[in-house]
Amino acid sequence: VRLVHLADLHLGFRQYHRLTPDGINQREADVALVFRRAMERVIALRPDVVLIVGDVFHSVRPMNAAIIEAFVQLQTLRLALPETEVVIVAGNHDRPRATETGSILELFSCIDERVHVVAAGYKSITLASCDMSVLAVPDLPAGAPWPEFEPDTRRAYNVVALHGEVEGMLPPNLAYPDRPIRPIPIDVIGPERWNYVALGHYHVHKKMAPNMYYCGSLEYLPPNMWSEMHEERATGVPGKGFIEYDLDGGTHRFHPIA
């Protein structure tokens, strides 16, 4: 069984005043373009599962163009890969702070029954087609208890998809906004008990344990673009992209996109 792990798409992100010939903010167009390239690569890889681990959008109320872009690309993915399961969790940028606001991410669950969205509160999702359980943990409100990280022993494969800060995420002396009251200790998650732990929130591809990774964002974005480039050069990470992971062989491959 193979999965693809993406995170921190930040569709709808805008910066500066430069426009494309079509009148779209240039940085918004850049972010949409790398997402399309990533989806094309994912379709070519034909994985069994696609995990999108938070911050699909840059804001809770994205512009219509960003919503349409995400919907079209996800629908294209599902049409091209009808047997592939898709799991989407909310991140700190696209999780509503008030329950009554609702989440635009729920729209994608309408594509078909193989698109699973967890926008508020953690949830275990059973993917019967590949005998897998996914513990989906979106960005949690400040002070909310951590879930019980317990694999489902009835399933052949157990995976965590978590958007948030895990202890050791940041290099020493690097400040980062939107930090939780306390990061999650790695031993609370217990990656050795899972087949794979997919993380989102940090924009640099980073190995936290042999089977536990931040995949990083697909494009260079604030707040720490220059620090990210420095870290990538220091650790030999070839830019931005996503992860392909083989659950049977425990093998990891990073696919650069930007």
Model-based region annotation:
Residues 1-68, 73, 82, 148, ...:
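N-terminal active-site segment of His-dependent metallophosphoesterases
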Residues 26-35, 186-189, 195-198, 229:
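Cap/insert and terminal regions of metallo-dependent hydrolase folds
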